[in-house]
UniProtKB/Swiss-Prot annotation:
Catalysis performed (reactions): N(6)-acetyl-L-lysyl-[histone] + H2O = L-lysyl-[histone] + acetate
GO cellular component: cytoplasm; cytosol; Golgi apparatus; histone deacetylase complex; nuclear speck; nucleoplasm; nucleus
In-chain residues carrying the UniProt-annotated modification Phosphothreonine: T292
Record GO biological process: B cell activation; B cell differentiation; cellular response to insulin stimulus; cellular response to lipopolysaccharide; epigenetic regulation of gene expression; inflammatory response; negative regulation of cell migration involved in sprouting angiogenesis; negative regulation of DNA-templated transcription
Cysteine disulfide links: none
Protein name: Histone deacetylase 5
């Protein structure tokens, strides 16, 4: 009964019947075949004579008819039951077979897995064993290398010990050591300078070798300096010649007057150390050609035919002949070629008066220095032919070299060495003092022209950042000659214990000059006091420069001497001086130079000069943002020499004004009244190319989104569109460490605000410790960084981030002070992610937060509004002012419930302590489907930002202008579709606050086209240029559901602190056009209600006047007057 089609099923009451095929089902007999056997005893009913054989009886039909239907049904049921049982058995057999096969396959699979795992473990073990072997081999190689290195070191040490032993046991006739190349070069330079010392009698002003020509050694108050000696022809520093037929009775020691400023004790101690330095091979710090920086300056060698003798006028000598040009000494401290007299600058330089009469050019000398009016007549006069330009440039250069060399060696000049270069104003004071004789003028003018030539040559070749200043030229030349001549420098002579001066005409002349000089100092002091009062009244007193921690005490002393003693030509700008930036550049660009060498490189900048070599040619100083200290400086008249008799007793000394550093003005021009330079009241733009140096060492800008091309592209776009020409370009500077510490910790400031070469010097408290070099991670590109995207450049990043902060400070201070209308800072790296002690998200120092703090501290700005529309939340700015009620921080950023960088900025973060309610976060949620666009940002400004800002009423508005929400930025760094045009309109709305004092600072944004378009739109709005109108589709569009939900939540939270936003909750879903119409209708309704209320009040007042009874005390008209 096994059926091949056992899987078929049956429907109905007997499903098991389907197990059998239909053919078998039809073969089931309907009737039961019964083969009856008749009883044998039964006679045949039909027998008769049929032959006797019984015939079978046909009972089929009868039996069939007689079978019971019930029996048939039972039989069928039994058969069906049997079939069902057989089917169940078959099912059980099949299931048992399936289970058996499944178990078998499972066991096979487990065996295969175990085998595979065993193979993997064996392979892993083999790999680990190979790595262990490789590491072991590497370790063995390293150990072998170390052993080899140790052996080499031991061998080298043994060799050195052997050499030292040989040197110790050497004979006296042998050399003691083999000098290095540097020692050889310095020794050769020393020997050459010694060999070039002139022989006596070389020129007409040389001192004859006669024993009587050397005077006595005059002792000074400083008895610690030993007497100097030298070979023949080199006079000792304190032995003085008696020139010509001058009688030795008139020789008198020099006396120190009250007009000479005392030098700092520290400078004196350092000078004493320099004097005691005996070996010429040691490093000299008093020369200008020894230091690394000064090696770049021009070294003028070569001497004219017939070298002159060495300096014939030394301090302490009697009055010498005017024929020696080196004895021409001006009152302002220029000593010409006198190598043994340190220069000291008086606080005020002399300027030419407008009335150039001959009497006003009468010259006199300082009574503490040798006079030039005694002795023989000068053989050189100055004529117009001597001041004529040489036709050949090479001849003129050769003449200048010979002149300088001759002056270094103590000789004088002839007419052919004169130059036509204009004399700087700071040197004109030299020509106003000295002898009134024509020969005194000639000798003095030679010095002035020669010093100017040397300054110009050194300026053309020296490093641009540290150009030579006319105020320092005299000292540079003097120190240079001291280096070449190898004559020791000593301190200025002090008051001696000598007898009173003889009553000679020369002595009387010096007394008169001393009295006049004291009168001049008194007048000068009065002028300074009056000028200080004027500046204080007008509120334009310049700020004192804040010192950088990296400036040493010696550098500060040197700068004060330059600014006060020599008369600095410019006043420091806000919080910084040019000398500070120069000092920082020295530290960063030439780190091997020490502080003493950098002291000599202080630059006194011109007001019109560039900020440095790093600044592009199009960056110029648009005007002095902070007024000069001396407002009476005037253009100078050309220098003219008059031959006038000396009449010191009758000509009063005129107080001279401070001179400019520019050359003298052409003759005949009248000096216009000096007015303080003011900025145009327009938009200021600040940018500095030094910020371009902050980049990864790999140099691949495609890997790093925050690269230097961002600000370069924006600057180029503003130039191409002509917007830059309408703006005031502001010179940037580097922020000081003290300014940065207003927001950041000292540890963070030192770590990211200093370069590794000067970090240890500045870290006096040892805050960084030994781990300062281990704070950075190695990036996949090969560079280093704070994290995976915030790169760091050890050499340039510290200066670049400080420059970004300083640029924004300069711009914001000028806007807050009313010098500029508004401003846009093109700076990088950004800063709004930088927290107090954490650098992240391309940010190191929070420029906007530092600016807000300093505006409040230094300019007393009351309330500051910071609007941050960067797509990333400004977690650093929020942290800085979270508890400050004077700074309102409003941020519009993508939040996505904390799933977007940096994850902060929830709407519930409203501030803490007294600053509750002064932190507003418009945190967009819902992702980028649909993206947030113009409609949503404009709606947020209409309903949240501007109402709260107007109620806050800030004094200054700072904007963290990140443009990564502009369309074109992909989702990881953006994802929104705000147009660049929209940011222009947002800027225009912010300009209605704080009287228009709005400063935008570039933050994020990495698509160059997008940030250029947005920057152009913002600058156009700041300049009040007509903006492109928004599309009508934008005005008709309604904000999306996610934005409406975000704004509803923000209004719900902020309405507890700002009641002005509550009325906008109902109209968040309206389009801009509908909102404008509603606001217009509301305004008209309010106006109508106001008119109705006024009319009703007037009617009520009139009715009250009509019905009110007349007071009893008021008499009626008909009543007679009493």
């Amino acid at each position: 009964m096994n059926s091949p089609n056992e899987s078929d099923g049956m429907s109905g009451r007997e499903p098991s019947l389907e197990i059998l095929p239909r053919t078998s089902l039809h073969s089931i007999p309907v009737t039961v075949e019964v083969k009856p056997v008749l009883p044998r005893a039964m006679p045949s009913s039909m027998g008769g004579g049929g032959g006797g054989s019984p015939s079978p009886v046909e009972l089929r039909g009868a039996l069939v008819g007689s079978v019971d239907p019930t029996l048939r049904e039972q039989q069928l049921q039994q058969e069906l039951l049997a079939l069902k049982q057989q089917q169940q058995l078959q099912k059980q057999l099949l299931f048992a077979e399936f289970q058996k096969q499944h178990d078998h396959l499972t066991r096979q699979h487990e065996v295969q897995l175990q085998k595979h795992l065993k193979q993997q473990q064996e392979m892993l073990a083999a790999k680990q064993q190979q790595e262990m072997l490789a590491a072991k081999r590497q370790q063995e190689l390293e150990q072998q290398r170390q052993r080899e290195q140790q052996r080499q070191e031991e061998l080298e040490k043994q060799r050195l010990e052997q050499q030292l032993l040989i040197l110790r046991n050497k004979e006296k006739s042998k050399e003691s050591a083999i000098a290095s190349t540097e020692v050889k070069l310095r020794l050769q330079e020393f020997l050459l300078s010694k060999s070039k010392e002139p022989t006596p009698g070389g020129l007409n002003h040389s001192l004859p070798q006669h024993p009587k020509c050397w005077g006595a050694h005059h002792a000074s108050l400083d008895q610690s300096s030993p007497p100097q000696s030298g070979p023949p022809g080199t006079p000792p520093s304190y032995k003085l010649p008696l020139p010509g037929p001058y009688d030795s009775r008139d020789d008198f020691p020099l006396r120190k007057t009250a007009s000479e400023p005392n030098l700092k004790v520290r400078s004196r101690l350092k000078q004493k150390v320099a004097e005691r330095r005996s070996s010429p091979l040691l490093r000299r710090k008093d020369g200008t050609v020894i230091s690394t920086f000064k090696k770049r300056a021009v070294e003028i060698t070569g001497a004219g035919p017939g070298a002159s003798s060495v300096c014939n006028s030394a301090p302490g000598s009697g009055p010498s002949s005017p024929n020696s040009s080196h004895s021409t000494i001006a009152e302002n401290g220029f000593t010409g070629s006198v190598p043994n007299i340190p220069t000291e600058m008086l606080p005020q330089h002399r300027a030419l008066p407008l009335d150039s009469s001959p009497n006003q050019f009468s010259l006199y000398t300082s009574p503490s220095l040798p006079n030039i009016s005694l002795g023989l007549q000068a053989t050189v006069t100055v004529t117009n032919s001597h001041l004529t330009a040489s036709p050949k440039l090479s001849t003129q250069q050769e003449a200048e070299r010979q002149a300088l060399q001759s002056l270094r060696q103590g000789g004088t000049l002839t007419g052919k060495f004169m130059s036509t270069s204009s004399i700087p104003g700071c040197l004109l004071g030299v020509a106003l003092e000295g002898d009134g004789s024509p020969h005194g003028h000639a000798s003095l003018l030679q010095h002035v022209l020669l010093l100017e030539q040397a300054r110009q040559q050194s300026t053309l070749i020296a490093v641009p950042l540290h150009g030579q200043s006319p105020l320092v030229t005299g000292e540079r030349v003097a120190t240079s000659m001291r280096t070449v001549g190898k004559l020791p420098r000593h301190r200025p002579l002090s008051r001696t214990q000598s007898s009173p001066l003889p009553q000679s005409p020369q002595a009387l002349q010096q007394l008169v000059m001393q009295q006049q000089h004291q009168q001049f100092l008194e007048k000068q002091k009065q002028q300074q006091l009056q000028l200080g009062k004027i500046l204080t009244k007008t509120g334009e007193l310049p700020r004192q420069p804040t010192t950088h921690p990296e400036e040493t005490e010696e550098e500060l002393t040197e700068q004060q001497e330059v600014l006060l003693g020599e008369g600095a030509l410019t006043m420091p700008r806000e919080g910084s001086t040019e000398s500070e930036s120069t000092q920082e550049d020295l530290e960063e660009e030439d780190e091997e130079d020490d502080g003493e060498e950098e002291e000599d490189c202080i630059q006194v900048k011109d007001e019109e000069g560039e900020s440095g070599a790093e600044e592009g040619p199009d960056l110029e100083e648009p005007g002095a943002g902070y007024k000069k200290l001396f407002s009476d400086a005037q253009p100078l008249q050309p220098l003219q020499v008059y031959q006038a008799p000396l009449s010191l007793a009758t000509v009063p000394h005129q107080a001279l004004g401070r001179t400019q550093s520019s050359p003298a003005a052409p003759g005949g021009m009248k000096s216009p009244p000096d007015q303080p330079v003011k900025h145009l009241f327009t938009t200021g733009v600040v940018y500095d190319t030094f910020m371009l140096k902050h980049q990864c060492m790999c140099g691949n800008t495609h890997v790093h989104p925050e690269h230097a091309g961002r600000i370069q592209s924006i600057w180029s776009r503003l130039q191409e569109t002509g917007l830059l020409s309408k703006c005031e370009r502001i010179r940037g500077r580097k922020a000081t460490l003290d300014e940065i510490q207003t927001v950041h910790s000292e540890y963070h400031t030192l770590l990211y605000g200093t370069s590794p070469l000067n970090r240890q010097k500045l870290d006096s408290k040892k805050l960084l410790g030994p781990i300062s070099q281990k704070m950075y991670a190695v990036l996949p590109c090969g560079g280093i960084g704070v994290d995976s995207d915030t790169v760091w450049n050890e050499m340039h990043s510290s200066s670049a981030v400080r420059m970004a902060v300083g640029c924004l400070l300069e711009l914001a201070f000028k806007v807050a002070a009313g010098e500029l209308k508004n401003g846009f800072a093109i700076i990088r790296p950004p800063g709004h992610h930088a927290e107090e002690s954490t650098a992240m998200g391309f940010c190191f120092f929070n420029s906007v937060a530092i600016t807000a703090k300093l505006l409040q501290q230094k300019l007393n700005v009351g309330k500051v509004l910071i609007v941050d529309w960067d797509i990333h939340h400004g977690n650093g700015t929020q942290q800085a002012f979270y508890n400050d009620p004077s700074v309102l921080y409003i941020s519009l950023h993508r939040y996505d419930n904390g799933n977007f960088f940096p994850g902060s900025g929830a709407p519930e973060e409203v501030g803490g302590g007294p600053g509750v309610g002064y932190n507003v976060n418009v945190a967009w949620t819902g992702g980028v489907d649909p993206p947030i666009g113009d409609v949503e940002y404009l709606t947020a400004f209409r309903t949240v930002v501007m109402p709260i800002a107007h109620e806050f009423s800030p004094d200054v508005v700072l904007v963290s202008a990140g443009f990564d929400a502009v369309e074109g930025h992909l989702s990881p760094l953006g994802g929104y579709s705000v147009t660049a045009r929209c940011f222009g309109h947002l800027t225009r709305q912010l300009m209605t606050l704080a009287g228009g004092r709005v400063v935008l600072a570039l933050e994020g944004g990495h698509d160059l086209t997008a940030i250029c378009d947005a920057s152009e739109a913002c600058v156009s709005a700041l300049l009040s240029v007509e903006l492109q109108p928004l599309d009508e589709a934008v005005l008709q569009q309604k904000p999306n559901i996610n934005a409406v939900a975000t704004l509803e939540k923000v209004i719900e939270i902020q309405s507890k602190h700002w009641s002005c936003v509550q009325k906008f909750a109902a109209g968040l879903g309206r389009s801009l056009r509908e909102a404008q119409a509603g606001e217009t209708e509301e305004a008209e309704t309010v106006s109508a209600m106001a008119l109705l209320s006024v009319g009703a009040e007037q009617a009520q007042a009139a009715a009250a006047r009509e019905h009110s009874p007349r007071p009893a005390e008021e008499p009626m008209e008909q009543e007679p007057a009493l």
